């Protein structure tokens, strides 16, 4: 099954299959049919909401949706964390609503990062029902209080944070149409935003690119890893669907590492300098992870990629060990195995089985990158403006 997932992923990011292996070419017709059926189902579902045959729920506090058009590597979860922390720093308690699917690695990572703070995380497929449970339990900041909050924020004065929920963040919300939102943020993987341009499963697209028209803000992620020409091409594509959309830029900045045997340990990035490193990951954009390790100054970098959200098993650990031994033979030194936080949070215990090697977890954080007239201040202003607009308050 893992091999099939990897093959489908390779097909999704390949535009021409003339030189592809026979297995890839044999699957393309079936994937094309499946994509057509998926597209029809998507149109029907969208129409049901458009004509109010399916109900949209309006929540009593501002809602920010963070989503994407394609699977994996778009920076969606780091952006959710960034917005959560910004809201807390501003004095509002956010509630993150997430499905928590595919092993729940993203939820576990958010819980670990945000533990001890006021941020609340609601997990469930029915996000309207999950929101109702949290709003009943904690209450919400009423409109008059939010007006006071925006007034104080405009004057750069402090607002005292409370347990009451002041904003809701929809994690992976772009295709979750049952909840109305006040700001729609679409995240795009700058390394390969559209893949082969087809809908799933033939391609990586969860919706046609026309869905960019619904977005209020576009964020190009991994902007530090792409060329200026690639960035211009992405901007032109986005603005071809919505000329007026503000475009921001983000990147993942490595901060430190920790040992899988001690999550409280703190290992400096310099530990990888001049070292042999085996990058092991089961994430949506392994290329970005590997490039970030290369930029630490590692002497030799090898990689072992699994499909997104893959749950490591004993045979995978054996594969990692064999690959590490091969790297040790090539480089004449014992390699360090590095994984991502999502891989660690998916199953922290199984990685401890690699006891013959040092296994480190790379910790990174999302940063808004200043390009042209956009920077972190203008992005934060956009967030506040959207929240204030719900109550017709000028921010």
Curated annotation (Swiss-Prot):
GO terms for biological process: lipid A biosynthetic process; lipid X metabolic process. It is an enzyme of class 2 (transferase). Residues 1-32 form a transit peptide. Pathway: Glycolipid biosynthesis; lipid IV(A) biosynthesis; lipid IV(A) from (3R)-3-hydroxytetradecanoyl-[acyl-carrier-protein] and UDP-N-acetyl-alpha-D-glucosamine: step 6/6. Its EC number is 2.7.1.130. It comes from the Eukaryota. Belongs to the LpxK family. Involved in the biosynthesis of lipid A, a phosphorylated glycolipid that in bacteria anchors the lipopolysaccharide to the outer membrane of the cell. Transfers the gamma-phosphate of ATP to the 4'-position of a tetraacyldisaccharide 1-phosphate intermediate (termed DS-1-P) to form tetraacyldisaccharide 1,4'-bis-phosphate (lipid IVA). Lipid A-like molecules in plants may serve as structural components of the outer membranes of mitochondria and/or chloroplasts, or may be involved in signal transduction or plant defense responses (Potential). This is Probable tetraacyldisaccharide 4'-kinase, mitochondrial. It comes from Arabidopsis thaliana (Mouse-ear cress).
